[in-house]
């Protein structure tokens, strides 16, 4: 039996964010103070049994609860007094509780040396001041090895992606001189992803995959130009769903002892649908491709000198009502190892041709947005030295993915 309690607390406060702005007949003159404090507890029980004849059983329960104490206040920059809602600015103070119960059970079974199966099913209850729902999450993995070096894998997986804590607060922030507003969304719910995937490994090095996934309530921050005011609104919304079907091939190759390369090719069909996206619902589809190549050239073994060249290209894609242009980059690095390989000197240049940063745009119904973001070539040097046989202790990292 494993009984555990984990408690996490995080607090982050930002003070004195000042804005003076006049746009048409509207004037914004304030500074803000906002703070996020999260108290989170996690309890879990887990048990495993070996039943013999290749059968193993596991089950358990996980309970997670968090309390989000956050606020955002507006102040007069001259008097320092707190502004009220009558000043067209909304102060926000929240005490939001979230609870999740997850109960699961699974098994694994080996059928000789060629076939192995593991499966599990989790039922989860998610409760917030807005949502109270039950969901099911199945996982099935089947591995078949007809001969050494050849492996066929079939898998059904499922997962949940929770929104950031600050994204569900009923708060409004201003950027771009007040023309751009960042809106919270108290109605956000977790996204649920289900994926079916098949992978074939040939000669222990060539990898071929095909998959289909469906993400219900997929969420992402989107941009909308208001039809009522001269502002653009950034807000994280739940779409009806996102779907992807894809194929992938990963092919390594070597040229004697001086070149070691890997080419990865990906083809995707992508769909996103939202029937209540403001006043402009959408159902968009796009096919695109990705190619990536990693090359390591051994210039010399004595001294140990290697040159690494990597390249990446991504054809046109979509995200919500955004159109994402073609992008790519080429990186290069020169590595020198010495002192019996305890010391490594690395010189590198990233995004040589300054093509890595995309400038997404919107041309959809009433929306017309053009962005231009600059690309920068990066040069750097790093030095690493290993003292004796020191190995860094493995520690579980604190999950801060949902914090502001």
Language-model-detected regions and their locations in the chain:
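Outer membrane beta-barrel strand-and-loop segments of large Gram-negative receptors
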Residues: 40-42, 92, 189, 195, ...
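Conserved C-terminal beta-signal and adjacent last beta-strands/turns
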Residues: 285-404
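Outer-membrane beta-barrel signature, preferentially recognizing the C-terminal barrel domain
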Residues: 96, 160-209, 214, 232-246, ...
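Transmembrane beta-strands of outer-membrane beta-barrel pores
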Residues: 63-69, 121-129, 156-162, 204, ...
């Amino acid at each position: 039996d494993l009984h555990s309690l984990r408690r996490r607390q995080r607090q982050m406060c930002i003070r004195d964010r000042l804005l003076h702005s006049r746009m048409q007949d509207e004037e914004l003159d304030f500074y803000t103070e906002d703070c996020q404090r999260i108290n989170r507890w996690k309890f879990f029980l887990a048990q495993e049994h070996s039943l013999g004849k290749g059968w193993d059983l596991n089950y358990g329960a996980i309970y997670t609860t968090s309390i989000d104490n956050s606020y955002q206040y507006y102040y007069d920059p001259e008097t320092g007094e707190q502004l009220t809602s009558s000043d067209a600015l909304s102060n926000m103070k929240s005490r939001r509780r979230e609870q999740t119960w997850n109960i699961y059970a699974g098994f694994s079974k080996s059928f000789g040396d060629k076939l192995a199966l593991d499966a599990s099913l989790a039922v989860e209850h998610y409760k917030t001041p807005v949502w109270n729902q039950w969901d099911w999450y199945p996982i099935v993995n089947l591995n078949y090895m007809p001969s050494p070096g050849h492996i066929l894998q079939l898998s059904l997986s499922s997962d949940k992606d929770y929104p950031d804590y600050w994204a569900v607060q009923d708060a409004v922030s201003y950027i771009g001189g007040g023309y751009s507003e960042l809106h919270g969304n108290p109605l956000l719910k977790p996204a649920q992803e289900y994926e079916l995937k098949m992978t074939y490994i040939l000669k222990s090095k060539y990898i071929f995959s095909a998959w289909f996934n469906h993400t219900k309530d997929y969420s992402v921050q989107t941009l909308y130009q208001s039809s009522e005011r001269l502002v653009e609104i950034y807000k994280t919304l739940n779409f009806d769903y996102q779907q992807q079907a894809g194929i992938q091939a990963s092919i390594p190759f070597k040229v004697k002892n001086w070149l070691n390369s890997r080419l990865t090719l990906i083809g995707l069909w992508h769909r996103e649908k939202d029937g209540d996206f403001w006043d402009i619902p959408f159902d968009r589809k796009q096919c695109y491709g990705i190619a990536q190549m990693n090359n390591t050239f051994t210039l010399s073994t004595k001294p140990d000198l290697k040159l690494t060249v990597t390249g990446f290209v991504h054809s046109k894609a979509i995200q919500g009502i955004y159109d994402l242009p073609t992008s790519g980059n080429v990186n290069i690095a020169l590595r020198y190892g010495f002192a019996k390989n305890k010391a490594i000197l690395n010189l590198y240049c990233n995004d040589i041709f300054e093509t890595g940063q995309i400038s997404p745009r919107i041309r959809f119904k009433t929306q017309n947005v053009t962005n231009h973001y600059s690309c920068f070539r990066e040069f750097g040097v790093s030095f690493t030295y290993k003292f004796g046989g020191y190995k860094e202790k493995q520690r579980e990292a604190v999950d801060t993915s949902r914090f502001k």
